[in-house]
Amino acid sequence: MSESGTLTNKESDTKILSVLVSDPQKQKTHSQTYITYQVSTKIDGKDEPNCVVRRYNDFVLLHQILINDHPALLVPPLPDKKVLNYLSGDRFSHSFTQKRCRSLQTFMRRLLSHSELSKSRILETFLTSTDWDVYRRSLTGQISTSEVSDVLINAFKHVNRQRDEFVEIKEKSEKLDHNLSHLDKLFHKSVKRVDLIGQNLKKLQSSLSGLQELCCDEKELSNSIKAFNDGTMQLIDSLNDLNKYVDYEYNVDIKDMINYIEALKQLIRLKDQKQIDYEELSEYLTRSINEKNNLLSGYGSGNYFKSKLEELAGINQEMARRDKIAKLETRVQSLTDEVEKSKQVADEFEKEVLKEVEQFEQIKTLELKDSLAALAQKHIDFYDDMVEKWSKIEERLESA
């Protein structure tokens, strides 16, 4: 990697306290339209936050560099690129940009929660540098994806000897993924139903307004209808606010957690690939040793007809046998070294993954707890507000 690339492997001395991703803005140039986000970083020892503007593609580059430089670490995932939104033009809609902003905020929070990734120099550069565009151009073509390719190629191979810890981790991940996916579907249906209820309430409110006009001569009845209609309008506004929170924040949090679990699965698959490499090398070494031992015992790996053909061709079988043995000894020695290296790599990678799983569990538990607590508080606030407002409506109805 070039000098600009070596920067990514260094640790930062800057202590980052918090990061806020906000203010998505639509930008236009002569050739393209895109969304930018303001990234505000609070740094220890500085009174004012450092603010920079980044595009989604800048986050993508940061993500790729972190994966490239830390293959054994669980780098949080970015929000998916919604292909349908891009085709329909909805990627510039308020809903799309706000949801993506929420996901990018989650991405940054997870990076800061990670014991090693939070110290990455590239993260500091991303958050504070005014020359990010120059740095980005200097890295063009240097990001490797070979590890991911290896995992895809060996997607149908399985580890022969899987540790019980990883069997349990996989089972727990699958179960959590299944439950969250079910929740995701339920809350998406809930958002649509509440939206439909809101539309029906608007129709009711419109009808009540018409009825109020018809009863203008009957002051008492007109006041009662107006009081009830005011309550209906307040209910519509509060219900829309609650539904927007569920749609823009809670549902996004669930989806981000599902993606986080998938990133963990991908890391475990990469760990499995290291184990598969070791197992395949070990099997190849065993076959080579057996073949050499057979030749030393005089049996050889060839059949009777092959021996006769070699004899008719004037090949000295004893010399050929010694030749094969020498080649096999060289191969066995080389494979023995490779197996030892592969075993060391697999074991070290496994240890790192176990550490990552532990950090994932901590971050996951905190996020789910905070997300559910915020959802519960939003509902509590909604019902408290409705009790207060409708109590006042009731007083108006009684005094009408």
UniProtKB/Swiss-Prot annotation:
It is a peripheral membrane protein. Residues 15-134 form the PX domain. Pfam families: PX. Residues 319-356 form a coiled coil. The gene is SNX4. SMART domains: PX. Keywords: Autophagy, Coiled coil, Cytoplasm, Endosome, Lipid-binding, Membrane, Protein transport, Transport. One of its GO terms (biological process) is endocytic recycling. Sorting nexin, involved in the separation or division of vacuoles throughout the entire life cycle of the cells. Involved in retrieval of late-Golgi SNAREs from post-Golgi endosomes to the trans-Golgi network, for cytoplasm to vacuole transport (Cvt), and autophagy of large cargos including mitophagy, pexophagy and glycophagy. The keyword Coiled coil applies. Gene3D superfamilies: Arfaptin homology (AH) domain/BAR domain, Phox-like domain. This is Sorting nexin-4. A 1,2-diacyl-sn-glycero-3-phospho-(1D-myo-inositol-3-phosphate) binds at residues 55, 81, 100.
